[in-house]
């Protein structure tokens, strides 16, 4: 394990403390704006497409840019939501039809969220094994994308962990839980400024120790820029705005934009076998999400798109941008409310 991951454990400790904010953050709501389905267990099924682009730039020649991405078509996901707890697990991966030319990618994903009205916290881990170079024309101008085989790295694995805590400034009229987890329903259009902190821990490893720079371009990159593996952590401060537009009671559109400043610590292993430590570098981060859906009394469904980007910088030496995007279609059902009169004491204490 590269050193950056062990140094990030202190950040995980901070977030473990913040998780408990959500257990005691059920602010009062205005019933004209928010209806709650808090005591009804939710079961949701998703068909999701996830991408994670690793963009490698040459600090000495910005026109040289290599983009590696997983060849993952879609993933079938099951989600359980009840009161403040939300869990999801990727169950089935559907193979891509072009796997013979771009290679196959294995993937795993798991999410755990703690959802109050004023505070919410989300934690997510995803793993991809197997990447292909999506723009091989940079190294081979004669490449034919219709018939040629893409350069494929079955040895390349990325592991990414996200965690965030956000605060809602208008919890009595706006519910983030309504659009994302359908634990509530937004009855009237409303929005809120939100602010929070987030943590990303990212590791990219190559089992073979081979550089990600194609042979044709090695002369364009200094040895210290010929990336083999990377470990990075980002602690970000975010402020933005989210708004839900309601149409005819049950139809909704949610737009979410949250930019921020990120403090990045990175370790890079290059072809010269030196590990370089780049600490406390300020970079930009931005998040965008839209959700369009239907939220009825029992059934709900919709589509959503989410993207987050961590921009690299020239002065970091090895210039790497990490771009994440998710698209999902979902449908879910609410079961009858749980009788809480005979719950064990431990569940009453944690309000679950």
Where is each model-derived feature located?
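Transmembrane beta-strands of outer-membrane beta-barrel pores
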Residues: 47-53, 82-86, 91-97, 116-118, ...
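Outer-membrane beta-barrel "beta-signal"
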Residues: 162-165, 323-352
